[in-house]
């Protein structure tokens, strides 16, 4: 299968890429940091030699970059699975967060998925997948998409918006047989939690999220996991 994963150089995106690479799929990856992305591709290719991995550095917070990345992917084939994972967390309260923080959060956490998805959809809709298969779009939302909290600011607003995008997209694509799944992770050991001592396994690992994404792709064409909420066993922090 052809699988596009954004924000794939580290954290949840890298874990999802590894889970699909382990199945010998064709991967199309992007991230902003070219060096880290290149290192990730090399690591995955050694570990999963049956996978075919293409990668391109891109800052999807820029509209044209998102469109160009989508067009580049389409040169190789029509995606079976799209994972909109690119995102960033910057804490702050509405009253005093840095000027422009909301715009920045919206650009990377919402508009990146919006513009990339719009670029890919005509082909995903226009060409039917093989019998017994369906195309699938995953949007990596957050617990912050479901529950407001102090210090969430522009980040939480952007994630609420991404959840709304995902729900609207699901309704639009039902007649075309394309699944849309929203993932709502709680605390995950990624860069957002750098410095946190997780030796006691208080919060989740990126591989937990990847396992659920992979599992959701295994359902029959007539079934979809619409919303997947994952939290640490002991609850949110």
Which residue stretches match the model-derived regions?
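Residue(s) in the substrate-gating loop at a strand-loop-helix junction
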Residues: 142
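The beta1-alpha1 cofactor-binding region of Rossmann-like NAD(H)/NADP(H)-dependent oxidoreductases
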Residues: 34-35, 57-68, 99
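C-terminal helical subdomain
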Residues: 182, 198-237
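Conserved glycine-rich cofactor-binding loop
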Residues: 9-11
């Amino acid at each position: 299968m052809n699988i596009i994963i954004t924000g794939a150089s580290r954290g949840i995106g890298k874990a999802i890429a590894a889970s699909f690479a382990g199945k010998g799929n064709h991967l199309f990856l992007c991230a902003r940091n070219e060096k880290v992305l290149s290192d990730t591709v090399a690591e995955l290719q050694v570990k999963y030699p049956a996978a075919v991995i293409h990668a391109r550095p891109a800052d999807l917070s820029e509209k044209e970059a998102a469109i160009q990345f989508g067009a580049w992917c389409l040169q190789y084939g029509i995606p079976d699975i799209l994972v909109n994972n690119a995102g960033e967390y910057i804490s702050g309260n509405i009253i005093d967060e840095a000027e422009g923080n909301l715009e920045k959060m919206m650009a990377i956490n919402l508009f990146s998925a919006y513009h990339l998805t719009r670029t890919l959809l005509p082909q995903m809709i226009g060409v039917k997948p093989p019998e017994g298969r369906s195309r699938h779009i995953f949007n990596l939302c957050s617990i912050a998409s479901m529950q407001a909290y102090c210090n969430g600011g522009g980040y939480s607003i952007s994630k609420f918006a991404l959840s709304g995008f995902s729900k609207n997209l699901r309704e639009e694509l039902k007649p075309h047989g394309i699944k849309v799944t929203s993932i709502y992770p709680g605390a995950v050991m990624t860069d957002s939690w750098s410095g946190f001592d997780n030796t006691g396994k208080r919060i989740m690992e990126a591989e937990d999220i990847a396992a659920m994404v992979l599992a959701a792709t295994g359902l029959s064409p007539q079934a979809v996991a619409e919303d997947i909420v994952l939290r640490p066993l002991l609850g949110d922090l």
